[in-house]
């Protein structure tokens, strides 16, 4: 390979692993004497894609055209900056005979985009083949709906929204106690058609959703119907489910943004993760009540951002501390203090709507405990009374929480 015809735009940490690969040869012609291939299942792609292992890293390499290689690499980087789940680009490579000659033939050029191989990521099509159950499909559709909602919330038009263009990855996260949990997330794996807009239009949103629905129809046709679990699929129900999950997540993202703008509080910093927009409504209502309380105490109007910080420090954090002291995990399994608090707030919100009046935090805790704890009634009753007694020391008299 004559390196004077090589353009290697690769991140420095990966450069030594990639610079001596056979970039002057079409990817389909690479052989195991030149590189170490990884035997990894891959999804449907219109481009040649190979997975390789170098001394220090594992990569996915896709052969494409020069413009697409550059555009995709830059787009992946921009998506990551916006917090979108997508591939991590290592860079792109061009190889062209007579690179600097004015009349060089375009067909003599080769272009590649290189991304870091995602550990524990699986193409949707493989997961469907393993398990085409209702639960499996809906888990994937929910992850894909959240990905699409995140894109649209950030004014990004996908252009080719499709099951074929996502990877499903199992990722680990930690709660406030450091307890690990595994979540399934969808990662955008092809950014060739991505457009980052100033404002995304309704037409763009509808087009992406329609395109994704078409891919659901296509994947349904791709699988044989001899399996009863596959023949009983209600595609219309699947589409409704996807649309509803998209709507829920898009509304949640807007609700979070509105809450953070109003209160100056960061959801992730204080509450780790909220998946229910009604929890946010309930928390905002508490902050507004705290604002009213502080204004009454001071005799003048208190700013809501000041009230929000006061509420965090003097109401919310002390309550979370009491939850931890009382070992609430013994009574509510698979939870943590922050999640329990937001779940109780959502429960309070629903019950208040149902009864047509604010039921208050004490009634909400009693009701939630009876509904969601598997402890026997006498033990649970003692726990709840002990908790409520401690909360009265935190919450001021005549304070509506």
Which residue ranges define each predicted feature?
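Conserved protein kinase catalytic/activation segment
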Residues: 165-188
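Catalytic-loop of the protein kinase fold
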Residues: 153-163
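Catalytic cores of glycan-processing enzymes that make or break glycosidic bonds
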Residues: 236-255, 277, 288, 333, ...
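Short glycine-biased active-site loop of nucleotidyltransferases that positions the nucleotide triphosphate
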Residues: 99-107, 176-181, 203
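Conserved ATP-binding subdomain of kinase catalytic cores across diverse folds
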Residues: 19-125, 130-134, 146-154, 264, ...
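A short, basic N-terminal segment
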Residues: 2-27
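C-lobe/activation-segment region of protein kinase-like
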Residues: 180-257
């Amino acid at each position: 390979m004559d390196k004077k015809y090589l353009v290697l735009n690769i991140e420095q940490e990966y450069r030594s692993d990639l610079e001596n690969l056979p970039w002057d040869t079409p990817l389909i012609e690479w052989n195991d004497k030149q590189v170490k291939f990884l035997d990894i299942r891959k999804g449907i792609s219109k481009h040649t894609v190979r997975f390789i292992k170098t001394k220090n890293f594992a990569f996915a390499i896709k052969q494409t055209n020069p413009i697409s290689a550059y555009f995709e690499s830059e787009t992946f980087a921009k998506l990551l900056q916006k917090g979108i789940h997508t591939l991590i680009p290592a860079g792109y490579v061009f190889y062209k005979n007579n690179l600097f000659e004015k009349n060089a033939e375009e067909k003599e050029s080769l272009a590649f985009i290189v991304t870091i191989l995602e550990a524990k990521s699986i193409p949707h099509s493989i997961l469907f083949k393993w398990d085409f159950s209702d639960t499996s499909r809906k888990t994937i559709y929910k992850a894909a709906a959240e990905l699409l909602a995140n894109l649209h919330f950030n004014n990004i038009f996908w252009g080719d929204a499709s099951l074929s263009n996502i990877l499903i990855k199992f990722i680990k996260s930690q709660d406030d106690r450091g307890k690990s949990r595994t979540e399934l997330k969808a990662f955008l794996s092809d950014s060739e058609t991505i457009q980052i807009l100033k404002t995304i239009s309704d037409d763009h949103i509808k087009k992406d959703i329609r395109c994704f629905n078409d891919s659901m129809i296509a994947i349904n046709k791709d699988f044989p119907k001899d399996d009863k679990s596959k023949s009983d699929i209600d595609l219309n129900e699947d589409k409704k489910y996807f649309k509803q999950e998209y709507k829920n997540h898009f509304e949640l993202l807007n609700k979070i943004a509105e809450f953070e703008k109003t209160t100056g509080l960061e959801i992730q910093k204080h509450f780790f993760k909220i998946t229910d927009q009604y929890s946010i409504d309930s928390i905002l209502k508490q902050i507004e009540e705290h604002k009213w309380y502080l204004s009454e105490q001071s005799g003048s109007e208190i700013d809501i951002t000041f009230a929000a910080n006061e509420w965090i420090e003097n109401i919310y954090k002390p309550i979370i501390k009491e939850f931890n002291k009382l070992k609430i995990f013994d009574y509510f399994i698979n939870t943590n203090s922050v999640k329990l608090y937001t779940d109780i707030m959502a429960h309070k919100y629903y019950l208040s709507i149902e009864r047509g009046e604010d039921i208050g935090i004490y009634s909400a805790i009693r009701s939630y405990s009876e509904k969601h704890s598997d402890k026997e009634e006498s033990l649970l009753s003692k726990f709840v009374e002990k908790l409520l007694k401690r909360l009265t020391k935190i919450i001021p008299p005549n304070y509506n929480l």
